[in-house]
């Protein structure tokens, strides 16, 4: 949507304030960075909450569109000898990347808090890919509406996390409802060094 706005701004350059254009451009660059961090080695989205393939354009198509609009958006590559920890406190997610591995973890509160209809009981879940192969993934979602399968996909057992006493970490019910929500306290993210 923001790329489309930039396209429109180019069509009406004298009508859009320069600061609005610049802010939109800066936001697009940040969004591509976030997309890279939250994606696996296969260049596709991770399956947290109601994520699924085939809903949004493929990453390569978005990069191509951005390039046509004048952005220098390339596939980001993690250096071969690096271990990079991305602690995205605003969203609650954490990504740990090397050149061949990507671990993405959900340390986020259930949200958005005002309307969490697309949330799953996936607190503390993670996904892991090695190269372009996904090793551990959450279920994501394959359908909407009210059904047993929808509830199963939103439940804790459909995610790579701990389920205690067959209970969901958050109370998900109906197709898009959440009652009591998991709360992650004392969130601490960092590298551990060996002695």
Model regions: which residues?
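CBM-like, beta-strand-rich accessory domains located in the C-terminal region of large
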Residues: 50-52, 142-195
